[in-house]
Amino acid sequence: MGYVINNNLLEQVLTLYRNKFVDTANNERVICRADEYFDISIGKTPPRKEPQWFSTNPQDVTWVSISDMGTCGLYISSSSEQLTKQAVERHNVKVVPNNTVLLSFKLTVGRIAITNGEMTTNEAIAHFKTDKKEINEYLYCYLKYFNYQTMGSTSSIATAVNSKIIKGMPFVVPTNDELEEFHGFAAPMFAKIKANQIETDNLTALRDTLLPKLMSGELDAFNIEI
């Protein structure tokens, strides 16, 4: 149910974006390189032959992969694999701030998510960092509609795109009035989606904790207080 609601909310935002910024021209918009507007960093993978840097303990540092971005929804808060804190420090893995837009650009190009909390990623993911957080909803939609085929030949797009190309990709900056209006509509929608995702994640975690205990008889369903 939450998935359907979130899809509907996101579709409303994408529809407004399409109407205002894709189907409607405005000569006052400025085009620049992405790295002229954002501080773009790239993730990292410690040496795989040294397993001490990797973990499957959710208490360790979240380390996002493209696979995680394929299942997370609009916001991402967890990963299937983690890094130890020592790995982040020793190998200088970039820590991504909360509420930062992520973009996959290797093998699977164009997956997008927004961080819910601080985390790290592997080297196939770019981080669009900015102090101007009101641009995030616009950036998310911009990347959703961006034609990644323009960044390499159709047959080799999965391998042709690299961090240099991502940093140099064109970014269309909306006018202040356009951004203020779009942010005013989109931000509450994104906040609702985030709240729904958190609630769903909490219910899923509760289910995963209780179900094995119920199945084993360790817990009695009639004595559970929710």
Q: What is each stretch, according to the model?
A:
Residues 32-174, 225:
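DNA target-recognition domains and sequence-specific DNA-contacting regions of bacterial/archaeal
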